[in-house]
Design a protein with these regions (language model features):
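Catalytic palm subdomain of template-directed nucleic-acid polymerases
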Residues: 15-33, 70, 108-137, 154-155, ...
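Short, flexible turn/loop "capping" segments at secondary-structure junctions
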Residues: 2-4, 62, 107-110, 173-177
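Short, conserved micro-motifs composed of acidic
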Residues: 58, 142-177
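Mobile genetic element proteins and their domesticated derivatives, centered on retroelements
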Residues: 13, 30, 43, 54, ...
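Conserved pre-catalytic core of RNA-dependent polymerases
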Residues: 1-83, 87
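Active-site palm subdomain of RNA-directed nucleic acid polymerases
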Residues: 80-112, 116
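Non-catalytic, peripheral interaction segments enriched in hydrophobic/basic residues
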Residues: 112-113, 140, 144-156, 179-281
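Conserved, non-catalytic sequence blocks in retroelement Pol enzymes and Pol-derived host proteins
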Residues: 1-4, 14-20, 32-38, 69-79, ...
Length: 281
């Protein structure tokens, strides 16, 4: 982008990724990495011993075992899933089709089941998608095209003449805003993030707390709740995403409006004095 180029991004959504992970496919990948036999047998025993059932109203079905799927909240689940789809990452890196930074391939960025493809051209992005989809099909996984999206960043971000499609012909739309790992990337001539959704979530969190304790709790308690429950929502991602002066002023206004409500004032100077008094800096 800094060299007047345009970067093409595709955020892929995998359909029920953790639920579709094949146990035997995972065991093969673990054996390829030559993990200890005892550990492999332990994992196999865990998966074989796991039982599930279906509840409908007050009725329960018979328990049955599953040949695929892992718990999304499990401690080991993210690591096992990362190992399971590692072949997708390696295939893209070896192709050298995507973008590179100092000769290091960054054509694919993966965190758990959130996949981001990055390419210098639309044609290259289509090739990356085809490579990923072929490998994912081999892993018995599929892409949810309706929840996936493409985005362009750079001088030609408004110019898009070619649609990105999956192997079976489903179109992945070009959008002005793409959500990845909780952050909203915006189509622009420079790398930009939107904090509009963060501000909405902050207001929801603050109003939920203030409506419960605003009339009975002290300012110290409300401010502590604001620090713990609301500020992390508002400031999520600001340490890694670029924040311009306009966005910074907008975030400051959101916080100031909440503090005005807590201290029951419309004066910014009073809010500043109260923040210093309560060490809220």
């Amino acid at each position: 982008v800094s060299c007047n180029s345009t970067v093409n991004i595709c955020a892929l959504d995998l359909s029920k990724a953790f639920d579709k992970m094949n146990h035997y496919g995972l065991f093969i990948k673990l054996m390829d990495r030559q993990i200890p036999v005892q550990l492999l047998q332990l994992l196999e025993f865990w998966f074989r011993s796991g039982l599930t059932c279906v509840k409908w109203g007050d009725c329960f079905s018979a328990f049955y075992s599953q040949a695929r799927g892992i718990r999304q909240g499990g401690v080991l689940s993210p690591y096992l899933f990362a190992l399971y789809i590692d072949s997708v990452i390696e295939k893209v890196r070896r192709s050298r089709v995507g973008c590179e930074i100092k000769l290091e391939s960054v054509g694919i960025i993966v965190y758990a089941d959130d996949i981001l493809l990055v390419a210098p051209t639309v044609t290259a992005l289509q090739l990356l998608l085809k490579m990923c989809e072929n490998e994912l099909n081999w892993l018995a996984m599929s892409i949810n095209a309706s929840k996936s999206a493409c985005l362009r960043i750079g001088k030609d971000y408004k110019t898009v003449s070619v649609c990105i499609r999956t192997i079976d012909g489903r179109e992945i739309p070009w959008q002005d805003n793409v959500r990845y790992l909780g952050m909203h990337l915006v189509a622009n001539n420079v790398f930009t993030c939107s904090f509009d959704n963060a501000k909405k979530s902050y207001y929801r969190a603050f109003n939920a707390i203030y409506s419960k304790i605003g009339g009975i709790a002290s300012e110290e308690v409300i401010l502590e709740m604001l620090k713990m429950k609301c500020l992390p929502v508002l400031l999520y991602g600001t340490d890694v995403c670029p924040v311009n002066k306009k966005q910074l002023k907008s975030l400051e206004y959101v916080l100031t409006s909440s503090l005005m409500k807590i201290f029951r004032t419309q004066s910014g100077d009073v809010v500043d004095d109260c923040m210093k008094f309560f060490w809220f800096v």
